[in-house]
Regions:
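Charge-rich, low-complexity intrinsically disordered regions
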Residues: 1-272
Length: 272
C-alpha cells in the first residue's frame, strides 16, 4: 500500500537484496561496478553497498551513479591471467544470460567463462574470437582439435606475444581435403560446404577432418554440393556415359571427377 513506513521496510528488507534503485542519487549496480574494494568487501550482499554509501561513501565524495561498466574486474583464474581473451563488460553484454545464472560477481562470471563458456567457444573479448583463431591456424587445430580451451590458453600464453591474430579470420585456412588417401580438393571446399549446409556443424562441430568425413561418408550419398567447382547433379546430367557406369551411386560421380574428370577437362558445374 501507500504507507511510507511499510514501503521503506519493504525496500530495506527485500528491495536492496534485489539491487533496486530507490533514488536518482544512488544506483547500487553503478556503485558496485565502480569500486573494486567494495566488491571484495560485500560481494553479492547488496545491502552492504547501500549501507556503505549511506555511512561513508556520500560523505567521502564517492560516485553513487554514472558507472555503466565494471572497473578493475578480476581476470586471473587458476594462476593464469585471461585479460587478453576476457573482458567482463564485453562478456556480460554479449551473453546476458550469464548474469541470470551467476549474478554480477566478477569472480563468479570469470569462473563461468573459464569452466563453461570456453567449452562453448564463447567470445569474451573484442580482441579474441576462438573460432577465428581456430580457422586461421592449422597447427593449432592439430594440437587442440575440439578442445576449445586450448585455443584461448594458447593465445594467452604465446599467441598474443607471438603476434598471432586473435580475430579477423572468417574462413578456415589449410583445411584437410584427404580422406582414405584420395584428395577431394577438386570437389570439396570446407568453407563453401559449411556455409551451404550449416546443419553439418550442428552434427559434427568445426573439426575439419570430421566435416570432411561427414561429407564423404554421408554428404555424397545425398549428392550435396561441397564446392563451387563441382555440382554432382550437373555432372551426372551432363555425362550420360557416367550414368550407365554409376547410376544412383552418387559417390561414383565425385570420385570420377577427382580421379579423371577434372584432368580430362570435363566441366564440373554449370558456368555462372
Amino acid at each position: 500500500g501507500y504507507d511510507d513506513q511499510k514501503v521503506l521496510n519493504y525496500f530495506v528488507e527485500q528491495g536492496m537484496a534485489q539491487h533496486q534503485q530507490a533514488s536518482a542519487e544512488f544506483d547500487p549496480v553503478s556503485y558496485r561496478f565502480e569500486y573494486a574494494d567494495l566488491r571484495k568487501a560485500y560481494g553479492d550482499t547488496w545491502a552492504g553497498y547501500y549501507n556503505h554509501y549511506v555511512r561513508w561513501g556520500k560523505a567521502a565524495g564517492l560516485h553513487g551513479t554514472g558507472c555503466t561498466e565494471m572497473k578493475g574486474y578480476v581476470t586471473v583464474y587458476g594462476g593464469l591471467d585471461y585479460a587478453s581473451v576476457y573482458d567482463y563488460n564485453y562478456y556480460i553484454e554479449k551473453y546476458p544470460e550469464v548474469v541470470n545464472k551467476v549474478g554480477y560477481d566478477d569472480q563468479k562470471v570469470l569462473n563461468y567463462f573459464v569452466e563453461q563458456g570456453m567449452a562453448q567457444h564463447q567470445q569474451a573479448s573484442a580482441q579474441f574470437d576462438p573460432v577465428s583463431y581456430r580457422f586461421e591456424y592449422a597447427d593449432l587445430r592439430k594440437a587442440y582439435g575440439d578442445t576449445w580451451a586450448g585455443y584461448y590458453r594458447h593465445y594467452v600464453r604465446w599467441g598474443e606475444a607471438g603476434g598471432l591474430h586473435g580475430t579477423g579470420c572468417t574462413e578456415m585456412k589449410g583445411y584437410v581435403t584427404v580422406y582414405g588417401s584420395l584428395d577431394y580438393a577438386s570437389v570439396y571446399d570446407y568453407n563453401y560446404y559449411i556455409a551451404k549446409y550449416p546443419e553439418v556443424l550442428n552434427k559434427v562441430g568445426y573439426d575439419d577432418q570430421k566435416v570432411l568425413n561427414y561429407f564423404v561418408e554421408q554428404g555424397m550419398a545425398q549428392h550435396q554440393q561441397a564446392s563451387a567447382e563441382f555440382d554432382p547433379v550437373y555432372y551426372r546430367n551432363s555425362n550420360p556415359s557416367l550414368q550407365n557406369a554409376y547410376g544412383d551411386t552418387w559417390a561414383g560421380y565425385y570420385n570420377h571427377y577427382v580421379r579423371w574428370g577434372k584432368a580430362a577437362g570435363l566441366q564440373g558445374a554449370e558456368q555462372q
